[in-house]
UniProtKB/Swiss-Prot annotation:
InterPro entries: Pectin_lyas_fold, Pectin_lyase_fold/virulence, Pectinesterase_cat, Pectinesterase_inhib_dom, Pectinesterase_Tyr_AS. Substrate binds at residues 263, 403, 405. PROSITE patterns: PECTINESTERASE_1. GO terms for biological process: cell wall modification; pectin catabolic process. GO terms for molecular function: enzyme inhibitor activity; pectinesterase activity. This is Probable pectinesterase 30.
Amino acid sequence: MLVKVFSFFILMIIMVIGVSKEYCDDKQSCQNLLLELKAGSSSLSEIRRRDLLIIVLKNSVRRIDMAMIGVMDDTKQHEEMENDMLGVKEDTNLFEEMMESEENSHTWLSSVLTSYITCIDEIGEGAYKRRVEPKLENLISRARVVLALFISISLRDNTELISVIPNGPSWLFHVDKKDLYLNAEIADVVVAKDGTGKYSTVNAAIAAAPQHSQKRFVIYIKTGIYDEIVVIENTKPNLTLIGDGQDLTIITGNLSASNVRRTYNTATVASNGNGFIGVDMCFRNTAGPAKGPAVALRVSGDMSVIYRCRVEGYQDALYPHSDRQFYRECFITGTVDFICGNAVAVFQFCQIVARQPKMGQSNVITAQSRATKDVKSGFSIQNCNITTSSDLDTATVKTYLGRPWRRFSTVAVLQSFIGDLVDPAGWTPWKGETGLSTLHYREYQNRGPGAVTSRRVKWSGFKVMKDPKKATEFTVAKLLDGETWLKESRIPYESGL
């Protein structure tokens, strides 16, 4: 019997690793991980594809969790890093629920890898980095291998799929069905500068929100300019901020890379909680074009929705950092890489507006940072208008649709208006030839003077799509798995093309 079990598992290894080199670059690491899992499993003779997925995921979470202990011991002397690691560790507590769907599991694993890479990017230099970096690299390596195995197993046989929850996981849009088109009578708490609300600051209202709640908590923010740095912790899911309008309710700050070491922490508003919804307000960073990265809004929680909001900044203005996000009817303006990050994000019916950058700079709309082919991430810009602000001198400043922050950067521009501000090349390199053959840049049925593709870049990673089936891969239904969760948000959306 033991011989049978072992032989079966070796067969599974051959099947999984043999799916193709395309899905597991480091075959030895994948095989070693599977052998680790075999040693801890007692009944593999009856294993099915779904069971193998669960074994891989559960055991990997446990091993990643153990590996994190060593990193966190070192980060106790570094408050920012410790908070980041605690955030990732907190996310593992949701994993049992996330496993109820392959889509959720893939998103979660991608998010974990994104968090590790963000940490190592922003550690800085010196003795601390030399001590912590090897441990973080170990975490990144393990997360990459787990992702590769996950993809390989998932693609083996789609006749037995893990069931997808009809309306998203229980922590999102729970039994309460509070309508998003709110007023002060329906909101849980009201923020007002004039004293007519329970709180006068946004931070005070967020502090009052319950932790780990499965019910939605709605904060209505009345007209006013709120000069404060707002951080929504990942212990506060299902939070809604709703204002009186994107020109009336404004949260503003001016942190930048010139006075805060990490781009990640420059955000005027940072949401780390799953199920975040922002409606009818403005997120602003006034640091200016000369101060470097300065984020107005960073979103790091899964199944987040930004609706009818204004995001206003310069470099790195909007930072869709990780997980699934949906932006609808928003006004987004900036200069260099002003939509950047590693989220799975779809933008529909948004105004994307390039403004005047620092002298000598070019504008770049997107800097998507998908690091490996197994990570689930990418930006889709659908039915949007890409235009210029009145202050942009298009005669002297070039504007591009995007550049690859990392090798597998993924961006699609679909059915959108592209103004004449966009350079005929369309896209620009990050550094030399890096990523030009591995990125995924796509355009489909765009219009406007900047949509002409005859002079676009000749990179092998760039394509003009003709087949609607291929373009469909970048829609809400396919890219976001939006049909399983967006409808409960009551935000309008287009599922397909």
